[in-house]
Each structure stands twice: as structure tokens, then as C-alpha cells.
Amino acid sequence: MLQLTEVTKSYGDRRALDEVSFAVADGRLTGFVGGNGAGKTTTMRIVLGVLAKDSGSVTLHGAPVAAADRRRFGYMPEERGLYPKMKVREHIVYLAKLHGFSHTDATRRATALLERLGLGERMNDMVEALSLGNQQRAQIAAALVHEPEVLILDEPFSGLDPLAVDVVAGVLHERAAAGAAVLFSSHQLDVVERLCDDLVIIAGGTIRASGSRDALRAEHASHRYELSTATATEWIGSLPGITVATGATDGVSFDAETPDAAQAVLREALARGPVSRFTRVQPTLADIFREVIR
């Protein structure tokens, strides 16, 4: 497990990170979200040793992260980092050989990974000849070719179409299933919500929320409920602690001041006739994000 504990970083008088603490668990995908300038890239660069922290600790399996550990890390920066005049597979093979693989093994790994990422027909093209989306896939291959123990990706889904997002997501899930700790940032909250096991939300250099996706949803549970019934529902608004809301796609939606008030609606609805659906509305990641950064 990768663990950050009370990590701080300042640039002059500006505090970029303020006692940042969170964990990236082995075998899990951790989504790292925040607005522009929130501190995501600074945090990642400190983990990778590109930037020095002012204080705090970064540990892997309980020990301080050393240079030897970082050789087992995979990193994809937000900026384009590949050599434009190299062929795609040649580039990935070169990087694999830097990690100690033989030319034969590096070629096998690069070929399999590029094919898995949908670049099988473009692996002999120059990097500069690829579309931005395909360059993004090639950068992901560069981060993955040595099968890293820790994988850190800064905006890996930027510029990808929905099909490419699905392909890349599948590759990341495979890496996590193999035991890697995977941390990725993204502004695409719907993609993060769909893919991640755990979430970290940062704003203004401070962690506003962290934990498993399901735990955060439960912690920030909505007071809104939806009810579908074959009978009239005008009576719902007359019950104590209930406010009828709009926006239900089927039936009626309402806000309940307490769970007991919501259960009173259900009991009354069942007394009046069959109920086909009664559910508490789950907050989206966008809902949670807006709530915690206020």
C-alpha cells in the first residue's frame, strides 16, 4: 500500500499542499479528483520524487519510498512525454529495456500491450503521426510495459472517445487485479465514479474526502427518495417532515427530514395500494464533490 501522511508543499508564501494524507491500496483503483490547481499533479510528483516535499512522509508497505521502489512505479504525466520521431513500438520496447528486460521480452511485452490498447495496426507508425487519443494510449502503454507495482496516471482518459475509455479502463482493472496500487486523476467525474474502488477529493491543497466509493456515498447519502405506485400520490406532501420534489423520472420524488419520515410515506403508500419501487436516491460523485468543496 502507498501511504501519504501529512505531506506539505509550499511555493514561496503559497501552500500548495496542506498536510495531505491518504492511501492507495494494493489491488484497487483510486480516483483522485479536484479542480484545476487543487494539488493533484503536485501530489503525484512528490510521490514520484520529481518534487521534494517540505514535510510529511510517503511510504510503500510501511517503509519510506526509495529510488529502488520508484523503479517499480509506472507514471503517465498529463503532458505528452513520448519522443515524436520514434516509432510507437520501438519507443515502448526502449522503455521496457530501460527496466531491464531483454530485447525479445521487451518486444513481446510491447506488442501485446499495444494490441490490447487498440494500437496493433499503428505500432510501426511514428508517434507524431498518431491522433492525440492514440498518443494517449501509447503513453499508457509506456507506463504499463514493465508491469509496475504502483501505477500513477495523470488524466489518462483525456482526449479518449467512449470506446477507448472502456479499453483503457479494462487494462487498468487488469493491472489492479494483478495486485498493483493504481492512482489516477481525472476531471471526468462520471468516468471516475464508474471505474474506481476508492476516492480522494482534494481542493485548495487539502483533502476534503477520502474512502471507498460506497462508504462515501453512504456518508453523503441524500435525503431524497423516489416512490412508484399505481395509486394517487397527492397526499405525500401533507405528511410531517416531507417535501415533494420535482425531477422524478417515474412516480414521485420527495425529501424526508428523517428516515422515519420516509418510512411513514412507504407505510401509507402500501396501505393505499401496491408499490412497485421505493428507493433512496444515491448521491453521484459530482454531488459529493460539490458538497465537500463548498
Locations of regions flagged by a protein language model:
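Short, flexible helix/strand-to-coil boundary loops that buttress conserved ligand/catalytic motifs
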Residues: 69, 220, 293
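C-terminal coupling/interaction segments
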Residues: 257-294
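Structural motif
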Residues: 80, 240-243, 273
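ABC transporter nucleotide-binding domains
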Residues: 9-203, 209
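Short alpha-helical
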Residues: 64, 83, 190, 234, ...
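Conserved catalytic Walker-motif region of ABC-type ATPase nucleotide-binding domains
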Residues: 4-7
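ABC transporter nucleotide-binding domain
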Residues: 169-256
